[in-house]
Amino acid sequence: RLVPIIDAGVKIEEGYDVYEEGVEKNYFCKRQDGSDFVAAVWPGYTHFPDVLNPDARKWFGEKYKRLTDAGIEGFWNDMNEPAIFFTPEGVKDVKEAMKAFIDKEETVQDVWAIRAQVTGLANNAEDYASMYHNVDGKMVRHDQVHNLFGYNMTRAAGEGLREISPDKRCLLFSRSSYIGMHRYGGIWT
């Protein structure tokens, strides 16, 4: 049996139908200025579906149909804290710090400061604070509802799979979770 890994990030790629539809319907998490939040994970730059928005959650759950139509009955939700490897803003800051570093004699402190900045790109608190969800028509910072993202991604999958295959019980487990997630799937630890 095949159990594919489903990551939260939707690859930013012109012509990719899931990406195009998500942008068109405004289903992705936002920045404070209303633009789509961009972060890099395995496929490169991505947008995260706003699974706290009921319409976006339903849409994301429906995307499992193309996989169930291919005979797949098990799913592993991963990277759904959501994990962030880096953002364009974080990389820009590191590049600027490196430019300042290149033209001077390095010290141990300088090297450790650069190292800390590079290793701090992943899952950076500032990135989570700059990502927003649509909760009942209000913009809510991700860092205030962080634990609900993995829960709602699993909820999207669980509800979608029940609608797609009401007479089947699909295998579904998730890396990230929250209280009550057991209604929709198991947790991978």
Listing of model-derived features with the role each one plays in the protein:
Residues 1-189:
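Catalytic-domain carbohydrate-binding cleft regions of carbohydrate-active enzymes
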